[in-house]
């Protein structure tokens, strides 16, 4: 079919595509936690950015509403950042060992 380098490159591209698809599925199904206020507010979020659980320490219910809202927003943002870090790590692992052309950068 393909000779030498081109055939090898096609096999590598197919392997990379399979690895990336597997990594994307793992990311979509993973759960990460975001926290704020030293763990007083916790958010459990999936890799699809769906919030599964919001946990608020009872001690915060007597505090002002604005502070609680800020802590919830910070915990959500922390969870999103945790997903992004994990996503980059998994995608980098999916392409590890692939001989990509010099200067080629993956879009993640």
Swiss-Prot record:
SUPFAM superfamilies reported in the protein's UniProt record: YbaB-like
Region: Disordered, residue numbers: 1-22
GO cellular component, one term: cytosol
Keyword terms: Cytoplasm, DNA-binding
Presence of the UniProt keyword Ribosomal protein in the record: no
InterPro entries linked: YbaB-like_sf (IPR036894), YbaB/EbfC (IPR004401)
GO molecular function: DNA binding
Biased composition (Polar residues): 11-22
NCBIfam families xrefs: DNA_YbaB_EbfC (TIGR00103)
Family: Belongs to the YbaB/EbfC family.
Summary of subunit composition and partner proteins: Homodimer.
PANTHER family in alphabetical order: NUCLEOID-ASSOCIATED PROTEIN YBAB
Job description of the protein: Binds to DNA and alters its conformation. May be involved in regulation of gene expression, nucleoid organization and DNA protection.
Protein name: Nucleoid-associated protein Mmwyl1_2533
């Amino acid at each position: 079919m393909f000779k030498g380098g081109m055939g090898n490159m096609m096999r590598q591209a197919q392997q990379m595509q399979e690895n990336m698809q597997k990594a994307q599925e793992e990311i979509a199904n993973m759960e990460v936690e975001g926290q704020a206020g030293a763990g007083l507010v916790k958010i459990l979020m999936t890799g699809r950015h769906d919030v599964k659980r919001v946990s608020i320490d009872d001690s915060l219910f007597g505090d002002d509403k604005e502070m609680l809202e800020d802590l919830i927003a910070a915990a959500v943002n922390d969870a999103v950042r945790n997903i992004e870090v994990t996503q980059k790590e998994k995608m980098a692992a999916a392409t590890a060992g692939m001989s990509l052309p010099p200067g080629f950068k993956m879009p993640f």
